[in-house]
């Protein structure tokens, strides 16, 4: 018996076109260009979910470095001093403290400097 696959093929194509919604021009209308655009977009999304983690870590380090320089200690010495003082604050929390509570960050920097 011959199988025509009409329903299955339509469903598969509609799934791709649904993912391409919001793309410009033929990339959201024509299956072939939409399929290419969706593949590319999913690849970028996969890549950038990983890059996001690196980007945020870079941002946190830049903020901590700026705040630690204001307290006359380098970033690397601050982190080393915190490890010696057994202060287990991660970079995300330290960066947030540096921005939202500079006085609190200064206390932490003093504690780190005392251990060096």
Swiss-Prot record:
Keyword NADP in record: no
GO cellular component, as recorded: ribonucleoprotein complex; ribosome
CDD domains: Ribosomal_L20
SUPFAM superfamilies cross-referenced by the UniProt entry: Ribosomal protein L20 (SSF74731)
Matching PROSITE patterns: RIBOSOMAL_L20
Keyword field contains Ribosomal protein: yes
Keyword entries, A-Z: Ribonucleoprotein, Ribosomal protein, RNA-binding, rRNA-binding
Protein name from the UniProt record: Large ribosomal subunit protein bL20
Source organism (scientific name): Desulforapulum autotrophicum (strain ATCC 43914 / DSM 3382 / VKM B-1955 / HRM2)
Top-level taxonomy: Bacteria, Pseudomonadati, Thermodesulfobacteriota, Desulfobacteria, Desulfobacterales
